[in-house]
Every structure is written in C-alpha cells, then in structure tokens.
Amino acid sequence: MKFNYKILHNYGNFLAVLKEIIFNVCEVREMSNDQTRAPVYEALEKLRRKRVVPFDVPGHKRGRGNPELVELLGEKCVGIDVNSMKPLDNLCHPVSVIRDAEELAARAFGAENAFLMVGGTTSAVQAMILSNCKRGDKIILPRNVHKSAINALVLCGAIPVYVNPEVNHQLGISLGMNLESVRKAVKENPDAVAVLVNNPTYYGICSDICSIVKLAHEHGMKVLADEAHGTHLYFQPQLPVSAMAAGADMAAVSMHKSGGSLTQSSILLTNKGVNADYVRQIINLTQTTSGSYLLLASLDISRRNLALRGEESFAKVMDMAE
C-alpha cells in the first residue's frame, strides 16, 4: 500500500491553521477579561479622530446642523452621538465591540451573560419577565414591585401571586419579602414558574435572597431580581449579597442609579442555564433599534470604573455613612 504524503502534508497544514485559530480565540477570550478596556468607547474615539463627514442619521450631523445643541452638550458629546455602523457594531445583534463590552460586563458582575440596555431598567425587568412567563403562567412577586413588572404582566398575560412585604411602622416604609411568606406562596402555588425579588428595595432593604433562590430552585422556579438599586452590591464584599452571587437566574441592574452611567442606561444579567439567544430575541421585541452610543459608552466606561475602583469607592462611602 502506497502512503499518500500529500494528504499528510495537507492534514499538517490543517492542524497548523486550526492551532492558530484556537490560539487566536483563546487570546481574544483572555483580552475580553481585561477590565481596563472599554471597547465601545475606544471604537467611538477611533471614529471621532477620523473626522468622517456624516451623510446618515442623526440629523444634527454631529453638531453641524444644530449649533444650539453643541453649545448645550459640547462638540465631543454630539460628535459621538452616531448611528450604528460596522466599526461600532449593532446593539440588536452584537458581534464585535458591543459584544466585547457585554462580555467584560458579565465578568465584572460575575454573570454568565450581560446585555447592555438603553431603555432603562424598566426594559430589563420586562425582558426578564417576558423571557420566563407566558399567558396564564404564575409569578410570585412582592406587592411593592416596580410598575415595570406590572406592565410586563399586562404584555405577557402572566398571573401575579403577591407577597405582602413587612412594614416598618416607625419609618413608614415597606421592607423585604419574608422567607416564610415566600414559602407559603410557593406551597400554595406549586405551578408558579418564577419568583421576583427586589434586591434591594427603593429604601435599601434586602430580602434573604440566598434562601429564596434555594427554595425556588427546589421547586423548579426561576428567580428574577430587580436590582435597580443594587449595582453597588457587586463591587463591595462587605455589602449584602448580589443576585448573581446568590444564584438568581436573571437580574436587572440600574447602572445609572449607583454605578455612574448616564440616566436610562442599564444592564441585564443572566446566570448559567439561561438561554442567552432567546433573551436577546425578547429584548429586541421592545428595545429600540437605534441604541444610543452615548448611553452604551457610559455603560462601558462605568463598568470599567467599577471593576477597577468600585470596591475602594464604596468602602469610602460606607466609612462616611458610619
């Protein structure tokens, strides 16, 4: 039998190419965990320096068409308020710099996946519920839930099972969900598909989310966390546990409230076992196709700031509070 050395040579070339591809992928993955980077912001700065003449939207033409806007916001601000284009990726289907920014956010927050949101945490909360609930499904949630959750129930037709939070009558504020109250709701509604938890509430009250996650998962229910006021929980170990660390399935995080990004910017986090592609489809049902790069860049820069300096910053705040 005559051995075909040409086949062996081609196979060797194939292995060499494959090795290079694997090396490059690993290198990209390693780079994607470099929290000093801000991929969206970097891409915007690169575009701005090229001084490209815009023939597309937005109509202010990076300030040239609206001098008053430039006077109000500044040349640099309006200069990076641009439309989606190849170097800047696309929020609806990210494949480059936005994808990289989302991967960095996922690692910074200890999540499996992260989605940059430009419709506020309202859109993130609604995406959580719409991803998990269909018409007629039950969802257990606190009576003092944000109205974005109620609006999501209107959209998907899910049935709320309310848990009344305890009340501090001295301060006149509602507290978190009592574990026994949640246990009772789970027992009475074993067909519920999810439990939603405020972590924390508007007043900073945290429920026992670790125990709630354990209870819900034991009964096959997903745990969704409204962390509109909980960004700081991810970056200071002396604070109460974050939803992702507690094992919740999804969390909506208002970066603009305590994370330093621009108003209306938010992040949706998912843990292992959540279908990220399906979540992306749900997000695209309601979120704009014209994502603001000002908001995206602010999320990118703020994530970097929190990852590098968040623990120290929040420690100072805690010291001042004491």
Which residue stretches match the model-derived regions?
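Conserved N-terminal alpha-helix of the aminotransferase class I/II PLP-enzyme fold
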Residues: V78-G120
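Short hydrophobic targeting helices and cationic amphipathic motifs
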Residues: Y5-L18
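Short glycine-rich, polar/acidic loop-and-turn segments at beta strand-coil junctions
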Residues: K61, G120-T121
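N-terminal "arm"/small-domain region of PLP-dependent enzymes with the aminotransferase-like
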Residues: V25-S96
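Conserved PLP-enzyme active-site core in the AAT-like
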Residues: R37-E45, R49, L69-L72, H93, ...
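Acidic, Ala/Val/Gly-enriched low-complexity intrinsically disordered segments
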Residues: A16-E20, V25-V28
